From Swiss-Prot:
The lineage of its organism: Bacteria, Bacillati, Bacillota, Bacilli, Bacillales. The gene is purD. Binds 1 Mg(2+) or Mn(2+) ion per subunit. This is Phosphoribosylamine--glycine ligase. Mg(2+) binds at residues 281, 283. It catalyses: 5-phospho-beta-D-ribosylamine + glycine + ATP = N(1)-(5-phospho-beta-D-ribosyl)glycinamide + ADP + phosphate + H(+). GO terms for biological process: 'de novo' IMP biosynthetic process; purine nucleobase biosynthetic process. It comes from Staphylococcus aureus (strain MW2). SUPFAM superfamilies: Glutathione synthetase ATP-binding domain-like, PreATP-grasp domain, Rudiment single hybrid motif.
Length: 415
Protein backbone atom coordinates (compact mmCIF):
# COMPACT_ATOMS: atom_id res chain seq x y z
CA UNK A 1 0.00 0.00 0.00
CA UNK A 2 0.98 3.65 -0.39
CA UNK A 3 1.32 5.66 2.82
CA UNK A 4 1.58 9.44 3.04
CA UNK A 5 3.26 10.80 6.16
CA UNK A 6 2.66 14.45 7.11
CA UNK A 7 5.34 16.46 8.91
CA UNK A 8 8.99 17.47 8.69
CA UNK A 9 10.62 16.75 12.05
CA UNK A 10 12.51 13.98 13.79
CA UNK A 11 9.28 12.31 14.91
CA UNK A 12 8.16 12.17 11.30
CA UNK A 13 11.59 10.90 10.21
CA UNK A 14 11.17 8.03 12.71
CA UNK A 15 7.60 7.36 11.55
CA UNK A 16 8.71 7.22 7.92
CA UNK A 17 11.59 4.90 8.88
CA UNK A 18 9.27 2.54 10.75
CA UNK A 19 6.54 2.59 8.08
CA UNK A 20 9.14 1.88 5.40
CA UNK A 21 10.13 -1.30 7.28
CA UNK A 22 6.62 -2.72 6.99
CA UNK A 23 5.99 -5.51 4.49
CA UNK A 24 2.52 -4.01 4.06
CA UNK A 25 3.89 -0.71 2.76
CA UNK A 26 5.00 -0.39 -0.85
CA UNK A 27 5.83 3.32 -0.87
CA UNK A 28 6.16 6.03 1.79
CA UNK A 29 5.57 9.63 0.72
CA UNK A 30 6.44 12.54 3.02
CA UNK A 31 4.91 16.05 2.93
CA UNK A 32 6.83 18.20 3.44
CA UNK A 33 9.32 15.75 4.98
CA UNK A 34 12.97 16.72 5.13
CA UNK A 35 15.86 15.87 2.87
CA UNK A 36 17.35 13.41 5.36
CA UNK A 37 14.32 11.16 4.72
CA UNK A 38 15.12 10.60 1.03
CA UNK A 39 16.59 7.07 1.50
CA UNK A 40 13.28 5.84 2.97
CA UNK A 41 10.58 8.07 1.48
CA UNK A 42 9.64 10.13 -1.56
CA UNK A 43 9.96 13.62 -0.08
CA UNK A 44 7.92 16.62 -1.26
CA UNK A 45 9.33 19.67 0.52
CA UNK A 46 7.61 21.88 -2.08
CA UNK A 47 4.23 21.19 -0.43
CA UNK A 48 3.45 22.77 2.94
CA UNK A 49 1.79 20.74 5.69
CA UNK A 50 -0.67 23.65 6.04
CA UNK A 51 -1.76 23.45 2.37
CA UNK A 52 -4.62 21.01 2.86
CA UNK A 53 -5.88 21.23 -0.72
CA UNK A 54 -2.44 20.43 -2.16
CA UNK A 55 -2.12 17.47 0.23
CA UNK A 56 -5.56 16.19 -0.81
CA UNK A 57 -4.72 16.57 -4.50
CA UNK A 58 -1.43 14.71 -3.99
CA UNK A 59 -3.13 11.87 -2.10
CA UNK A 60 -5.62 11.45 -4.94
CA UNK A 61 -2.92 11.59 -7.60
CA UNK A 62 -0.71 8.99 -5.90
CA UNK A 63 -3.53 6.62 -4.90
CA UNK A 64 -2.61 6.90 -1.24
CA UNK A 65 -4.14 4.21 1.00
CA UNK A 66 -3.31 5.70 4.40
CA UNK A 67 -2.28 9.13 5.68
CA UNK A 68 -0.30 9.28 8.94
CA UNK A 69 -0.24 12.78 10.48
CA UNK A 70 2.75 13.48 12.72
CA UNK A 71 2.53 17.05 14.10
CA UNK A 72 -0.20 18.65 16.17
CA UNK A 73 -0.91 21.75 14.06
CA UNK A 74 -2.38 19.96 11.00
CA UNK A 75 -4.58 17.88 13.34
CA UNK A 76 -5.89 20.93 15.15
CA UNK A 77 -6.40 22.67 11.79
CA UNK A 78 -8.62 19.80 10.61
CA UNK A 79 -6.47 18.08 7.98
CA UNK A 80 -7.77 14.65 9.05
CA UNK A 81 -11.37 15.84 8.56
CA UNK A 82 -10.75 17.00 4.99
CA UNK A 83 -8.95 13.78 4.03
CA UNK A 84 -11.60 11.53 5.61
CA UNK A 85 -14.38 13.49 3.89
CA UNK A 86 -12.70 12.53 0.62
CA UNK A 87 -12.52 8.84 1.45
CA UNK A 88 -8.96 8.53 2.78
CA UNK A 89 -7.93 6.47 5.80
CA UNK A 90 -6.17 8.71 8.32
CA UNK A 91 -4.16 7.89 11.43
CA UNK A 92 -4.76 10.97 13.56
CA UNK A 93 -7.79 12.50 15.29
CA UNK A 94 -10.27 14.90 13.75
CA UNK A 95 -10.32 18.60 14.61
CA UNK A 96 -12.83 18.24 17.44
CA UNK A 97 -11.00 15.37 19.16
CA UNK A 98 -7.60 17.09 18.73
CA UNK A 99 -8.82 19.79 21.14
CA UNK A 100 -7.54 17.51 23.90
CA UNK A 101 -4.13 18.92 22.97
CA UNK A 102 -5.22 22.18 21.37
CA UNK A 103 -6.84 23.51 24.55
CA UNK A 104 -5.43 22.84 28.01
CA UNK A 105 -8.71 24.08 29.49
CA UNK A 106 -10.71 21.61 27.37
CA UNK A 107 -8.55 18.76 28.69
CA UNK A 108 -8.79 19.93 32.32
CA UNK A 109 -12.58 20.21 32.16
CA UNK A 110 -13.00 16.68 30.78
CA UNK A 111 -10.65 15.29 33.44
CA UNK A 112 -12.55 17.16 36.15
CA UNK A 113 -15.93 15.90 34.93
CA UNK A 114 -14.82 12.25 34.74
CA UNK A 115 -12.58 12.22 37.84
CA UNK A 116 -9.40 11.48 35.92
CA UNK A 117 -6.45 12.21 38.26
CA UNK A 118 -4.70 15.50 37.51
CA UNK A 119 -3.54 18.64 39.33
CA UNK A 120 -6.07 21.10 40.75
CA UNK A 121 -6.40 24.13 38.50
CA UNK A 122 -7.71 27.65 38.14
CA UNK A 123 -8.57 29.26 34.81
CA UNK A 124 -8.36 33.01 34.21
CA UNK A 125 -9.35 34.97 31.13
CA UNK A 126 -7.74 38.35 31.82
CA UNK A 127 -4.22 39.46 32.64
CA UNK A 128 -5.29 41.55 35.64
CA UNK A 129 -7.10 38.55 37.16
CA UNK A 130 -4.00 36.41 36.65
CA UNK A 131 -1.86 38.97 38.47
CA UNK A 132 -4.40 39.08 41.32
CA UNK A 133 -4.56 35.28 41.59
CA UNK A 134 -0.82 34.78 42.10
CA UNK A 135 -0.72 37.14 45.08
CA UNK A 136 -2.24 34.43 47.30
CA UNK A 137 -1.69 31.16 45.43
CA UNK A 138 0.45 28.32 46.70
CA UNK A 139 3.99 28.24 45.29
CA UNK A 140 5.47 26.80 43.22
CA UNK A 141 2.67 27.23 40.69
CA UNK A 142 2.49 25.92 37.13
CA UNK A 143 1.43 28.54 34.56
CA UNK A 144 0.09 27.23 31.24
CA UNK A 145 -0.99 29.17 28.18
CA UNK A 146 -4.11 27.74 26.59
CA UNK A 147 -3.51 26.54 23.05
CA UNK A 148 -0.45 25.20 21.23
CA UNK A 149 3.03 26.32 22.20
CA UNK A 150 5.36 23.65 20.71
CA UNK A 151 6.07 22.26 24.17
CA UNK A 152 7.17 25.65 25.48
CA UNK A 153 3.91 27.10 26.84
CA UNK A 154 4.49 25.95 30.43
CA UNK A 155 6.40 27.80 33.15
CA UNK A 156 6.94 26.57 36.72
CA UNK A 157 7.16 29.62 38.98
CA UNK A 158 8.83 29.23 42.39
CA UNK A 159 8.32 32.84 43.49
CA UNK A 160 5.72 35.57 43.00
CA UNK A 161 8.27 37.46 40.89
CA UNK A 162 8.69 34.42 38.64
CA UNK A 163 4.90 34.03 38.41
CA UNK A 164 4.53 37.70 37.41
CA UNK A 165 7.21 37.21 34.77
CA UNK A 166 5.40 34.10 33.49
CA UNK A 167 2.15 36.06 33.15
CA UNK A 168 3.95 38.80 31.22
CA UNK A 169 5.36 36.16 28.87
CA UNK A 170 1.97 34.45 28.42
CA UNK A 171 -0.01 37.63 27.77
CA UNK A 172 2.59 39.87 26.14
CA UNK A 173 0.80 43.07 25.09
CA UNK A 174 -2.64 41.45 25.31
CA UNK A 175 -5.01 42.01 28.24
CA UNK A 176 -7.24 39.00 27.57
CA UNK A 177 -6.66 35.32 26.90
CA UNK A 178 -6.99 32.02 28.73
CA UNK A 179 -4.26 30.99 31.14
CA UNK A 180 -4.47 27.93 33.38
CA UNK A 181 -2.79 27.81 36.79
CA UNK A 182 -2.09 24.36 38.21
CA UNK A 183 -0.94 23.03 41.54
CA UNK A 184 2.66 21.88 41.23
CA UNK A 185 2.95 18.09 41.38
CA UNK A 186 6.05 16.33 42.68
CA UNK A 187 7.14 12.97 41.36
CA UNK A 188 8.64 11.09 38.45
CA UNK A 189 7.39 12.09 34.99
CA UNK A 190 6.86 9.61 32.16
CA UNK A 191 5.24 9.40 28.73
CA UNK A 192 2.72 6.72 27.75
CA UNK A 193 1.58 6.42 24.13
CA UNK A 194 -1.87 4.88 23.72
CA UNK A 195 -3.55 3.81 20.49
CA UNK A 196 -7.18 4.94 20.67
CA UNK A 197 -10.22 4.20 18.51
CA UNK A 198 -13.34 5.53 20.22
CA UNK A 199 -13.54 3.77 23.58
CA UNK A 200 -10.89 1.20 22.61
CA UNK A 201 -7.60 2.22 24.24
CA UNK A 202 -4.47 0.10 23.74
CA UNK A 203 -1.48 1.55 25.62
CA UNK A 204 2.10 0.77 24.69
CA UNK A 205 3.55 -1.68 27.22
CA UNK A 206 6.77 0.33 27.03
CA UNK A 207 6.98 3.85 28.44
CA UNK A 208 9.52 6.57 27.75
CA UNK A 209 10.93 9.45 29.74
CA UNK A 210 11.47 12.85 28.14
CA UNK A 211 13.86 15.64 29.19
CA UNK A 212 12.05 18.95 28.75
CA UNK A 213 14.51 21.47 30.22
CA UNK A 214 17.19 22.91 27.94
CA UNK A 215 20.24 22.27 30.10
CA UNK A 216 21.87 19.65 32.33
CA UNK A 217 20.38 18.92 35.77
CA UNK A 218 16.93 19.98 34.48
CA UNK A 219 17.92 23.64 34.40
CA UNK A 220 16.87 26.34 31.95
CA UNK A 221 13.61 26.91 30.08
CA UNK A 222 11.25 24.23 28.79
CA UNK A 223 11.84 23.00 25.26
CA UNK A 224 10.11 20.61 22.88
CA UNK A 225 12.37 17.89 24.36
CA UNK A 226 16.17 17.50 24.59
CA UNK A 227 16.27 13.72 24.73
CA UNK A 228 14.42 10.60 25.80
CA UNK A 229 14.95 6.96 26.62
CA UNK A 230 13.01 3.73 26.95
CA UNK A 231 12.18 1.54 28.71
CA UNK A 232 12.14 3.33 32.09
CA UNK A 233 13.45 0.75 34.59
CA UNK A 234 12.47 2.63 37.75
CA UNK A 235 8.78 2.85 36.77
CA UNK A 236 7.20 -0.55 37.27
CA UNK A 237 4.69 -2.52 35.22
CA UNK A 238 2.25 -2.01 38.10
CA UNK A 239 2.43 1.76 37.54
CA UNK A 240 1.82 1.27 33.82
CA UNK A 241 -1.17 -0.94 34.63
CA UNK A 242 -2.55 1.64 37.06
CA UNK A 243 -2.05 4.44 34.51
CA UNK A 244 -4.01 2.40 31.99
CA UNK A 245 -6.84 1.73 34.45
CA UNK A 246 -7.14 5.23 35.92
CA UNK A 247 -6.20 7.41 32.93
CA UNK A 248 -5.97 5.73 29.49
CA UNK A 249 -9.23 3.76 29.57
CA UNK A 250 -11.28 6.48 31.32
CA UNK A 251 -10.17 9.30 28.99
CA UNK A 252 -11.01 7.26 25.87
CA UNK A 253 -14.47 6.52 27.25
CA UNK A 254 -14.91 10.14 28.39
CA UNK A 255 -14.03 11.55 24.97
CA UNK A 256 -16.47 9.22 23.22
CA UNK A 257 -19.15 9.95 25.81
CA UNK A 258 -18.73 13.68 25.12
CA UNK A 259 -19.16 13.06 21.39
CA UNK A 260 -15.51 13.15 20.33
CA UNK A 261 -14.44 10.23 18.13
CA UNK A 262 -10.68 9.98 18.71
CA UNK A 263 -8.70 7.81 16.30
CA UNK A 264 -4.92 7.87 16.50
CA UNK A 265 -2.30 7.95 19.20
CA UNK A 266 -2.99 9.73 22.49
CA UNK A 267 0.13 10.86 24.32
CA UNK A 268 -0.35 10.75 28.09
CA UNK A 269 2.19 12.94 29.85
CA UNK A 270 1.94 11.64 33.41
CA UNK A 271 3.65 12.01 36.77
CA UNK A 272 3.93 9.36 39.46
CA UNK A 273 3.00 11.14 42.69
CA UNK A 274 2.73 9.68 46.19
CA UNK A 275 -1.01 9.39 45.42
CA UNK A 276 -0.48 7.49 42.17
CA UNK A 277 -0.16 8.57 38.52
CA UNK A 278 -1.69 11.90 37.49
CA UNK A 279 -2.02 13.64 34.12
CA UNK A 280 0.26 16.56 33.33
CA UNK A 281 -0.84 16.88 29.70
CA UNK A 282 -2.43 15.10 26.77
CA UNK A 283 -1.19 15.31 23.21
CA UNK A 284 -3.10 14.15 20.15
CA UNK A 285 -0.01 12.62 18.50
CA UNK A 286 3.30 10.91 19.21
CA UNK A 287 5.74 12.73 21.46
CA UNK A 288 8.94 14.11 19.98
CA UNK A 289 11.55 12.80 20.86
CA UNK A 290 9.68 9.92 22.54
CA UNK A 291 8.54 8.60 19.14
CA UNK A 292 12.13 8.26 17.97
CA UNK A 293 13.19 6.05 20.89
CA UNK A 294 9.94 4.04 21.12
CA UNK A 295 9.77 3.31 17.39
CA UNK A 296 13.46 2.36 17.42
CA UNK A 297 12.69 -0.22 20.11
CA UNK A 298 9.44 -1.46 18.52
CA UNK A 299 9.97 -4.83 16.87
CA UNK A 300 6.43 -5.29 15.53
CA UNK A 301 4.91 -3.70 12.43
CA UNK A 302 3.60 -0.16 13.02
CA UNK A 303 1.39 -0.28 9.91
CA UNK A 304 -0.18 -3.54 11.11
CA UNK A 305 -0.92 -1.91 14.48
CA UNK A 306 -2.66 1.00 12.73
CA UNK A 307 -4.78 -1.39 10.64
CA UNK A 308 -5.62 -3.49 13.73
CA UNK A 309 -6.75 -0.36 15.56
CA UNK A 310 -8.90 0.70 12.60
CA UNK A 311 -10.58 -2.73 12.69
CA UNK A 312 -11.23 -2.45 16.43
CA UNK A 313 -8.71 -5.12 17.39
CA UNK A 314 -6.68 -5.00 20.60
CA UNK A 315 -3.33 -5.02 18.83
CA UNK A 316 -0.25 -6.49 20.55
CA UNK A 317 3.00 -4.55 20.46
CA UNK A 318 6.33 -6.38 20.46
CA UNK A 319 9.59 -4.83 21.63
CA UNK A 320 13.28 -5.55 21.12
CA UNK A 321 15.10 -6.74 24.24
CA UNK A 322 17.25 -3.62 24.44
CA UNK A 323 17.34 -0.09 25.80
CA UNK A 324 17.24 3.01 23.59
CA UNK A 325 18.61 6.46 24.47
CA UNK A 326 18.13 9.50 22.22
CA UNK A 327 20.15 12.71 22.65
CA UNK A 328 18.97 15.87 20.88
CA UNK A 329 21.44 18.36 19.43
CA UNK A 330 19.98 21.85 19.12
CA UNK A 331 21.04 25.20 17.69
CA UNK A 332 22.84 27.39 20.21
CA UNK A 333 20.32 29.87 21.61
CA UNK A 334 17.35 27.46 21.44
CA UNK A 335 14.59 27.66 22.71
CA UNK A 336 15.10 31.42 22.32
CA UNK A 337 16.58 33.12 19.24
CA UNK A 338 19.08 31.07 17.25
CA UNK A 339 20.93 31.31 13.96
CA UNK A 340 20.25 29.14 10.92
CA UNK A 341 22.41 28.05 8.02
CA UNK A 342 25.33 26.48 9.90
CA UNK A 343 26.97 23.37 8.45
CA UNK A 344 26.48 20.02 10.22
CA UNK A 345 28.31 16.85 9.17
CA UNK A 346 29.59 13.52 10.50
CA UNK A 347 26.28 11.64 10.62
CA UNK A 348 24.85 8.92 8.39
CA UNK A 349 21.33 8.80 6.99
CA UNK A 350 20.35 5.64 8.84
CA UNK A 351 18.50 4.56 11.97
CA UNK A 352 21.21 6.07 14.21
CA UNK A 353 20.09 9.65 13.53
CA UNK A 354 16.69 11.29 13.14
CA UNK A 355 16.71 14.79 11.68
CA UNK A 356 14.52 17.62 12.98
CA UNK A 357 16.05 20.84 11.69
CA UNK A 358 18.44 20.40 8.78
CA UNK A 359 18.15 21.21 5.09
CA UNK A 360 20.37 20.52 2.10
CA UNK A 361 22.56 23.33 0.77
CA UNK A 362 24.41 21.91 -2.19
CA UNK A 363 25.98 18.66 -0.99
CA UNK A 364 25.95 19.57 2.71
CA UNK A 365 23.35 19.86 5.45
CA UNK A 366 22.84 23.18 7.26
CA UNK A 367 20.73 24.03 10.29
CA UNK A 368 17.17 25.17 9.66
CA UNK A 369 15.54 24.81 13.09
CA UNK A 370 15.96 24.91 16.85
CA UNK A 371 16.12 21.20 17.50
CA UNK A 372 18.41 19.81 14.81
CA UNK A 373 19.22 16.09 15.07
CA UNK A 374 18.67 13.24 17.52
CA UNK A 375 21.43 10.66 18.02
CA UNK A 376 20.14 7.17 18.89
CA UNK A 377 22.05 4.79 21.15
CA UNK A 378 21.21 1.12 21.68
CA UNK A 379 22.37 -1.38 24.29
CA UNK A 380 21.50 -4.31 26.52
CA UNK A 381 20.75 -1.82 29.32
CA UNK A 382 20.31 1.93 29.79
CA UNK A 383 23.98 2.45 30.65
CA UNK A 384 25.20 0.78 27.44
CA UNK A 385 22.58 2.61 25.35
CA UNK A 386 23.58 5.94 26.91
CA UNK A 387 27.25 5.29 26.14
CA UNK A 388 26.36 4.40 22.54
CA UNK A 389 24.19 7.52 22.15
CA UNK A 390 26.96 9.87 23.25
CA UNK A 391 29.39 8.06 20.96
CA UNK A 392 26.98 8.88 18.11
CA UNK A 393 26.80 12.50 19.35
CA UNK A 394 30.61 12.76 19.27
CA UNK A 395 30.65 11.91 15.57
CA UNK A 396 28.57 14.97 14.66
CA UNK A 397 30.68 17.92 13.56
CA UNK A 398 29.39 21.45 14.17
CA UNK A 399 30.42 24.48 16.22
CA UNK A 400 26.86 25.74 16.47
CA UNK A 401 25.03 22.97 18.35
CA UNK A 402 24.60 22.13 22.02
CA UNK A 403 23.19 19.14 23.88
CA UNK A 404 22.53 17.83 27.36
CA UNK A 405 25.14 15.50 28.87
CA UNK A 406 22.79 13.78 31.33
CA UNK A 407 20.08 12.13 29.21
CA UNK A 408 18.92 8.93 31.00
CA UNK A 409 21.09 9.63 34.08
CA UNK A 410 17.99 9.36 36.25
CA UNK A 411 17.54 5.71 35.26
CA UNK A 412 21.13 4.98 36.29
CA UNK A 413 20.80 6.81 39.62
CA UNK A 414 17.46 5.23 40.58
CA UNK A 415 17.94 1.68 39.32
Amino acid sequence: MNVLEIGAGGREHALAYKLNQSNLVKQVFAIPGNEAMTPIAEVHTEISESDHQAILDFAKRQNVDWVVIGPEQPLIDGLADILRANGFKVFGPNKQAAQIEGSKLFAKKIMEKYNIPTADYKEVERKKDALTYIENCELPVVVKKDGLAAGKGVIIADTIEAARSAIEIMYGDEEEGTVVFETFLEGEEFSLMTFVNGDLAVPFDCIAQDHKRAFDHDEGPNTGGMGAYCPVPHISDDVLKLTNETIAQPIAKAMLNEGYQFFGVLYIGAILTKNGPKVIEFNARFGDPEAQVLLSRMESDLMQHIIDLDEGKRTEFKWKNESIVGVMLASKGYPDAYEKGHKVSGFDLNENYFVSGLKKQGDTFVTSGGRVILAIGKGDNVQDAQRDAYEKVSQIQSDHLFYRHDIANKALQLK
